[in-house]
Amino acid sequence: VFRFTSPRVLAALVAAGLVATGLAAVADGSAQAVTTGATATTALSSNWYAAAPYLMPLQNDPPDPTAVMAATGIKAFQLAFILAPNSGGCTPTWDGTNPVSSDTTVGPMISAIRAAGGDVSVSIGGYNGTKLGQVCGTPAATAAAYQQVITTYGLHAIDFDLEEPEYENATAVANEIGAAQILQQEDPGLYVSVTTPGTTSGTGWFGEQMLDQAKTDGFTPNNFSIMPFDGGFNGAASQISALEAFNTILMNTFGWTSAQAYAHEGVSMMNGRSDSGEYFYQSDFQTVLNFAESVGLARYTNWSVNRDLPCTPVDNNDQTSGSCSSVAQQPWDFTKYSVLFAGATPPVSPPTSTPTSTPTPTPTGSPTSSPTSSPTSGPTSTPTGGSCTAAAWSSATAYTGGAVVSYGGDRWTAKWWTQNDTPGGPAGVWTNDGPC
């Protein structure tokens, strides 16, 4: 059942002229939801909204989300983006061109996701287009526009993606943060994330101003997330350094301990080649995931499911694409890390003695060969039980559940999908079958 709109937000809806498009006011000041093409459902546990990767439902060759769910085990997607109309006005649209009030495409997609056992969060803002916070005159009017989206789709989660040029406009930021606070108050249980650009020092001056606005308003979302890409980053180590710096910024802004700050901090990465030519591989996602789990990070997501496919050619001629990653991968490799963050196990493929396919070698910068020496904990000599016949483990190869490799003189079997997780390592994804 849809959330009912409170009198406070209803008044703003009336003022904004939104009632006729999705709500029918009743005499006592409440509102009734009308049929919209997206069936409401019970909320998922918050870990799925925290792990939901971004997906553009109308652009960049959107994949079938239910097929991605079946292949990976992912249960939630972050649908992007809600913007102001390109023609002007304070009403919500998809990508500035498709009014939410007359949507016939995204609603059925959401219903299909829910029918498959999943759900969505909707992201507002992004890098391109005019944001509602820029054109709606007040936080209440901005909230009213977003409330239409929440009511139309029966949402349990929403993301505020505050980027350039909007977050350079103090009034627009005040409208967005104020709107987020209103929605949080008027829609009990609504999961709210705030996402902003990351820098090698955490976030920039405008990001810190946004945090100051939230502190002034007394607003605390489920998390503040940074995007550590397109800013001179070089792999996972630089991203982790940025997250540690952002943790310090959150501590200093809100007076939190480091643990409290991490519990309100998130990361939104970009898989493959970024807009500025940085490269992020599966091994980088695994390393950041390990860090996120070790410190209790509140959110782990990425841009985007549309891009979680191999290009042809694999490197896409050193170009960034909205519909493939420009690095060697199998379909949905990066989405599976979100599944792991949510605490689930990706689906296991039928057992096989060797990987079902050998990915094309990754571009320079990603591990491409097995270690040159065995771990110190492994045997120092070849066991007498015979020579290993299974293929040697390689950090560059993606293995499915049941795959068998040799490493350190032992035979190992993968428990589930894995890449760059050393047999016997802390990830625990390999079963030691003994000497080979």
Place the predicted regions along the sequence by residue.
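Secretory targeting and sorting signals
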Residues: V1-V34, T368, T376
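Conserved active-site loop/cleft motifs that coordinate metal ions or position small ligands
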Residues: G266-M269, R299-S304
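A recurrent domain-boundary module in secreted/ectodomain proteins
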Residues: D308, P313-G365, G428-C436
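Tryptophan-rich substrate-binding surfaces of secreted polymer-degrading and adhesive proteins
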Residues: T360-C436
